[in-house]
Amino acid sequence: MSAKKVFLSVVFLLVFAIVFSEEYALVLSGGGGKGAYQVGVWKALKEYGIAQKVSVISGTSAGGLNAALFACESLENAEKIWLNEVPSKLTKDQKLISQEGLSEILDSVPLENIKDSYAQVYVTAVRDRLKLLKFIDSKLNGSSIGRHAYYFELNNDSFDEIKSKLLATSAFPVICDSVFVDDGDGGHYYSDGGEESIGGDNIPIKPVIEGYPEIKNIIVVYLSDQKHVSRRISAKDYDKINIIEFFPSIDLDGDSAFESLLDGTANFSNSRIRLLIQKGYEDTVDYFMRRKLYPVSSYWFE
């Protein structure tokens, strides 16, 4: 081999090593049944070799549940849970959102495997006490987004501790009961971490920014299209951070809060879930194709 070919081979290997050593963080917003969209995004991220480089996952509500699933289950099992378990158990006893059904699903998931996960996993919840005062505070003093959010790391928790935090982050206000969490501060009741009207954080990027300054690529997956999303992360707010945003390319919310709840957040039908998984996959693949990126064989990551 000529010296030139040797040199080019070395350069290629160095570039390859740099590209594939990049770390990513994944931020998953909440949205109930719309969370199926994130499963499709994750599927595409695996095909393109990105999911294997995600070292932090931070989620709230449905995004928190997915954060845990992605860290302790295979993609195939996560997809099966959404398609086969969620439609029947989340609407158990004809409830809009069944906490009992979610509890049954979580009992079948190996949550204890999160401690062995490559990725650090965080979920967000809002302490339940004084909800009304928090709501009034937000109205009197302007935005309270994130002011009352608690960010829980799951990697060192037991099965029961993880389960309680997942039930808490997904405890939709009014519809669901708040959940007791042993939080190291005497224990408190918590509810949906994505409810920003009472100080929650539906785009929980904070644990990544504050805890992992070395991560320069952050993927944010929203569960509303750009027309309906109430808040989005701005790259200009974070110095030298590459913010990669994914929005559903279709309207998941409808034209009213009522439609958003019934047709979006509380829609757990198998057909809807299947559609959202496919749409999340297609939107993510489209993002990569427009940037002339292609799937990679990822067997060396497994």
Stretch-by-stretch model annotation:
Residues 20-57, 68-302:
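Patatin-like phospholipase
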Residues 59, 63:
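Gly/Ala-rich beta-loop-alpha elbow adjacent to hydrolase catalytic centers
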